[in-house]
C-alpha cells in the first residue's frame, strides 16, 4: 500500500480478500468478536487482560492463543485486535517501530473519520493505544516518541 493510498482510504476500504468466516472461530472467540466492535472497546478489552511477561520463554500467540491463555503482550495484542476488528470492517493493519535501544513496539492501526489511531498493549501505559485524532501517520508515530 502506498503512502497516498493510506492517506486517502476510508476506514472500510474495499477489501482484496474477505475476513475469515464465522466458522473459523471457536464459540468463545466469536463471542468476544461480537462483544467488542470498535477500536475503543477492543483497547479496553486488551487492557483488562494480564500482561504476558513470557516467564516460560518467548511467546507469539495468535488471537486464539490469547483467548486460551488470557494474557497478552504488545505483538499478541496487535494480532488479536486485527482478528477482532477485521470482522467489523477494519483492515488488518499493523505498525511496528523500534526504539533507539532496539525494542520493538507493534500496534494495530486504524482510521476513523479521516484520523489515525491505534490499539496497543504495553508494559508502559504511555505506549498503549491512541484515540483517532492524528491527521497523518507521522503525527501518530511522533506521539509515541516521548509519551
Residue ranges and their predicted role:
Residues 2-147:
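A structural boundary/capping signal
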